[in-house]
Design a protein with these regions (language model features):
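A juxtamembrane structural motif centered on a specific transmembrane helix
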Residues: 1-10, 16, 241, 426-441, ...
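Alpha-helical transmembrane segments of multi-pass inner-membrane proteins
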Residues: 2-4, 8-14, 20-23, 45-52, ...
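N-terminal signal-anchor transmembrane segment
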Residues: 4-102, 126-133
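Helix-loop-helix junctions and helix-breaking kinks within/between transmembrane helices
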Residues: 27-40, 77-88, 212-216, 244-285, ...
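Aromatic-anchored transmembrane helix interface
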Residues: 82-93, 112-129, 136-163, 173, ...
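Long extracytoplasmic/lumenal interhelical loops at the membrane interface
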Residues: 199, 330-345, 349-353, 357-405, ...
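Loop-to-helix entry and N-terminal half of a specific, functionally important transmembrane alpha helix
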Residues: 248-251, 392-396, 403, 414-416, ...
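A membrane-periplasm/extracellular boundary helix in multi-pass inner-membrane enzymes
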Residues: 259-260, 277-332, 349-353, 361
Length: 512
């Protein structure tokens, strides 16, 4: 039999794709007929994922900020709930490895700006080797090896994004993903509430009840938008009403944060314009921002209980200030917090027993038994504290890192913060807001400042890295690009100076 040797690769691809499509159609049809919807969703998800990677091509890395910028629903896989970012980063890692093997990309690991992240990761790896957790735990929704998995994927995302170079258009796409993520998260959470689905805490797995439940999700999208506004436009542009819609958006974000119940989020909302005024060197707007913040909060605090009654969740946001609040907030009035106090006590005890190394995310039977006894003892705070302690959500970054992995890890995290802030300052000083590189640098500076502000009330050794290291990797790449540009400009200036000097010498010699 003679075969046509002129069959092209696209023709082969179409034939193979058609055959696979027909086979998959039969498979899906039988699954739907058998009402095996878990298998249907799994297959459709796989096709969508593969299609996304093929469509993006060399821009496959965009799936990392896209997946981490929004709260996508978990994907059922093998009887376990797998988060979309976990699959996205795993897929990106596989493609990155393949492109390294084919010399289309380079992996850059050992350079000075990577040292803080490398030290952090090496320390976590050492503790894991000393106190390992079985691989079966990767199926857990919270705790144990799932946190190690997230740290490993966060490190992979950092390496992938820090080893690339970016254009202005790439950074604009990233901000587009962040805005999309903020909008999607709002719509998804509101839809879940409207459909009656229970709100599950992502750290403990507990169902949240009461007035302070889904409201918490309002703060993250609002802060994303406010941080972007403060990074892209100077205070003069905002307050001079050159773009009046910016102030309108800020007011909407203020109301969202107020209704979120997040006390520290309100402080971050007012912090962003102040940092922007300092970075843009428009210092007069520091006082303008402070005046507006005092007027807004003062009106709400003074008016509460006299002129109007705020919703309970809004009162919670302001409860750290002295005011006429509902008795519901007696235990947290003035900044007091019995819940965090109990968590800090447990974390401090762990640090006393394991000050240098800690035991990582390993959970033994004694901790589980203690949590059960605490829950059986009675009070609502006791039940919450037990679940959060097992989930390593200490609500204090420094105590939490030290309790999990020893005091040295807290020191390493502080070094990471300093390194990130310094790189942000240098990148913004070089690019300013005229380039999206500078906008991202200032955005991350504000974001990191918020992290430091809230370090005594929030934080998780694994989740922090999971949500932030991809941004650190992007910053490292932009910082290295900036250094190369500055070096190139100095070399060019030096050559031009040498050429002018040589030209003058020739002219002088010709005259004499």
């Amino acid at each position: 039999m003679n075969l046509d040797r002129h069959i092209s690769m696209p023709q082969i691809t179409w034939v193979v794709g058609t055959l696979l499509g027909l086979a998959m159609a039969v498979f899906l049809g039988s699954a739907v007929g058998g009402q095996d919807f878990a298998r249907v969703s799994l297959v459709l998800g796989a096709f969508i994922g593969i299609g996304a990677f093929l469509a993006l091509g060399k821009n496959y890395w965009m799936l990392i900020p896209l997946s981490l910028g929004a709260s996508f629903p978990a994907i059922p896989l093998g009887g376990r709930a797998i988060e979309f970012p976990e699959l996205a980063i795993a897929g990106c890692s596989a493609i990155f490895a393949a492109r390294i093997a084919t010399r289309k990309e380079k992996l850059v690991v050992f350079r000075s700006v990577n040292v803080p992240i490398l030290l952090f990761s090496a320390w976590v790896g050492m503790v894991y080797a000393m106190y390992p957790v079985g691989f079966a735990m990767f199926g857990s929704a919270q705790g144990g090896g799932r946190f190690y998995l997230k740290l490993g994927l966060a490190f992979a995302a950092f390496l992938i994004l820090s080893s690339r170079t970016y254009s202005e258009r790439d950074i604009k796409w990233i901000f587009g993903f962040l805005i999309f993520g903020a909008a999607f998260t709002l719509v998804y959470d509101f839809s879940s509430v409207a459909l009656g689905a229970p709100v599950i805490d992502q750290t403990t797995g507990m169902v949240q009840e009461g007035f302070y439940t889904w409201h918490q999700t309002l703060s993250a999208p609002a802060l994303t938008i406010v941080f972007l506004i403060s990074a892209k436009w100077s205070p003069r542009e905002i307050w001079s009403l050159q773009r009046p819609w910016l102030l309108a958006v800020y007011v909407v974000c203020f109301l969202m944060v107020l209704m979120s119940g997040k006390r520290m989020a309100l402080a971050a909302l007012f912090m962003a314009p102040l940092v922007s005024a300092i970075m843009f060197r428009q210092y007069v707007y520091i006082f303008v921002g402070l005046g507006v913040a005092l007027a807004a909060t003062g009106t709400l605090v003074v008016g509460q209980g006299q002129w109007f009654t705020l919703p309970l969740v809004a009162q919670r946001t302001l409860s750290w200030l002295p005011g006429n609040w509902d008795p519901e907030f007696d235990n947290i009035a003035g900044g007091a917090d019995d819940f965090r106090k109990e968590l800090r006590f447990i974390a401090t005890e762990l640090i006393k027993h394991h000050p240098l190394i800690g035991r990582g995310f390993a959970v033994d039977i004694r901790e589980t038994a203690t949590a059960i006894m605490v829950a059986d003892r009675g009070g609502g705070i006791d039940i919450q504290v037990a679940a959060f302690a097992l989930g390593r959500s200490w609500h204090n970054r420094w105590l939490g890192y030290s309790a999990d992995f020893g005091i040295p890890l807290s020191v390493m995290q502080s070094i990471i913060y300093v390194a990130v802030l310094l790189m942000c300052v240098r990148c913004f000083g070089y690019s300013g807001s005229r380039k999206w590189f500078g906008v991202f640098a200032l955005y991350l500076f504000i974001f990191t400042t918020r992290d430091i502000m809230a370090s005594h009330t929030s934080g998780h050794t694994s989740i922090d890295a999971w949500q932030r290291w991809w941004m650190y990797g992007l910053l490292v790449s932009l910082y290295v690009q900036m250094l190369k540009e500055k070096t190139g400009m100095r070399v060019l200036t030096s050559h031009q100076g040498t050429a002018r000097s040589t030209s003058k010498d020739i002219t002088w010699a010709s005259k004499h």
